[in-house]
Design a protein with these regions (language model features):
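Glycine-rich, charge-decorated loop segments at or immediately adjacent to ligand/cofactor-binding or catalytic sites
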Residues: 85-90, 159-181
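Conserved functional hotspot residues or short segments at active or partner-binding sites
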Residues: 275, 279-381
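Glycine/threonine-rich flexible loop motifs
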Residues: 132-144
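Glycine-rich oxoanion-binding loops at beta->alpha junctions
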Residues: 93-123, 135
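Short internal beta-strands
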Residues: 74-81, 161
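Conserved anion/nucleotide-ligand pocket segment
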Residues: 182-254
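Glycine-rich, aromatic-lined ligand/substrate-binding cores of catalytic
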Residues: 225-302
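Bacterial N-terminal signal peptides
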Residues: 12-21
């Protein structure tokens, strides 16, 4: 009997490790493909790398360490949150020398958001390896765009080591950006959720002339990634991309509640162990708010009453493949919170913070629609022509 149990245990263990190995092999990142090609694309060139802690191969080895060992790495460039991803959102990052490589790490989230000619001196090729989250307001894609522009201006080739979009390649949601509201949190005229990998977006930025000067662009494609994959399907380990994106599912919650959290009044679980996974405000009744949310069409999303001190609202559980329009869900939550709050959320929010809200939204239209009492379903439906047009326009830039 003991032998039979041992055999069963061995079979189960083998099955477990086989499944684990299969999951790990599901997707090869751009950096993995570059490694398999013996870094031939970068050999004999002085390399500048735009990266942070998310720039790593599928085994977790940092891209900057790999390029230091196998190529001539001469400069690093870091986005919001810094080289280690620990700085708070919106906080300026200082340039410093990286202890791990001995290479200077120039901050692109300080006095400048774009590499200066001095920062690019002695660089033959710029390489981008950052993990994005698939949402327009997350600034890593803005950093990519500014670096592409600098590369074009200085006639430096630009290489993107591609990575998965953690919310998948099929989800396209939200309004575009009005020209006067383009900013570092809305750098490109794309929907709030774009469904592109960074490599595909780079191709679109170049092809649509969204920078002042196009660059000589190469995308090192992934192997094994498909548009229907969310992060959990890739078999890859998630490296927190910033302090409040600790898990591979965090981008889903960021999309749903992050926009509302730009206003004064709403609480979205920050600081805390579950950022973006709850939403509420003072004197909001958790039961009635949750009952309202359960009455809307949000397949794949569960709501539970949530209270913390005087804050009332709901906690969210979002399935990675939830069909619900998560940006639209944010409008429902914003509308109901605004209805239950006095004075309304927009009057509570001071000028500079309200300005950030408009920039994240891409204009003042969401404020206007909510204040006018336009039903959320009508607001969300008004986005569809833009979403459909974007799907058609982006098609020629897709790689997967």
């Amino acid at each position: 009997m003991g032998r039979v149990r041992n055999k069963k245990w061995i079979v189960r263990a083998c099955a477990f490790w086989f499944c684990l190995a299969s999951a790990q092999a599901a997707v090869e990142l751009g950096i993995d493909v570059l490694k398999s090609q013996d870094y031939s694309l970068l050999k004999g060139k002085r390399v500048g790398l735009i990266t942070n802690q998310t720039g790593a191969d599928s085994d977790g080895t940092k891209t900057r360490l790999l390029l230091k060992q196998h190529c001539n790495l001469v400069a690093l460039y870091t986005p919001e949150h810094g080289l280690d991803g620990t700085e708070k959102a919106g906080r300026y990052v200082k340039s410093r020398r990286d202890r791990a490589t001995g290479v200077m790490a120039y901050s692109l989230y300080g006095p400048t958001r774009k590499p200066t000619p001095a920062m690019l001196r002695g660089v033959d090729v710029l390489v981008f390896d950052l993990q994005d989250i698939g949402c327009r307001s997350y600034t890593y894609i803005s950093t990519m765009g500014r670096c592409m522009e600098a590369a074009g201006e200085n006639k430096i080739p630009f290489v993107v080591l591609d990575r998965p979009n953690p919310v998948g390649g099929l989800r396209v949601e939200g309004p575009s950006v009005e020209p006067r509201w383009r900013s570092f949190v809305s750098e490109f005229p794309i929907p709030y959720v774009h469904g592109l990998t960074v490599g595909e977006l780079a191709r679109m930025v170049n092809g649509r002339h969204w920078t002042s000067v196009p660059c000589d662009l190469t995308v090192v494609q992934m192997h094994g990634w498909r548009r229907g994959m969310t992060w959990d399907d890739t078999g890859l380990r998630w490296i927190p991309s910033s302090p409040n994106i600790p898990r591979g599912t965090s981008p889903l919650y960021y999309i749903a509640t992050g926009l509302v959290g730009e206003l004064s009044g709403p609480e979205i679980g920050i600081p805390g162990p579950r950022p973006f996974q709850s939403i509420g405000a003072r004197r909001v009744d958790p039961a009635s708010f949750t009952r309202y949310l359960r009455g809307i069409d949000a397949p794949g999303v569960e709501f539970r009453p949530w209270r913390e001190g005087s804050i009332g609202g709901s906690s969210l559980t979002i399935s990675p493949d939830a069909p619900a329009n998560l940006t639209g869900l944010g409008i429902y939550m914003l509308s109901e919170l605004n209805r239950q709050t006095r004075p309304d959320l927009f009057r509570r929010t001071e000028g500079s913070k309200l300005d950030i809200f408009y920039k994240v939204c891409g204009g003042t239209f969401i404020r206007d629609q909510v204040r006018e009492g336009i039903p959320p379903r009508t607001v969300v439906a008004s986005w569809r022509p833009n979403e459909d047009e974007f799907r058609r326009t982006r098609a020629k830039y897709l790689l997967y």
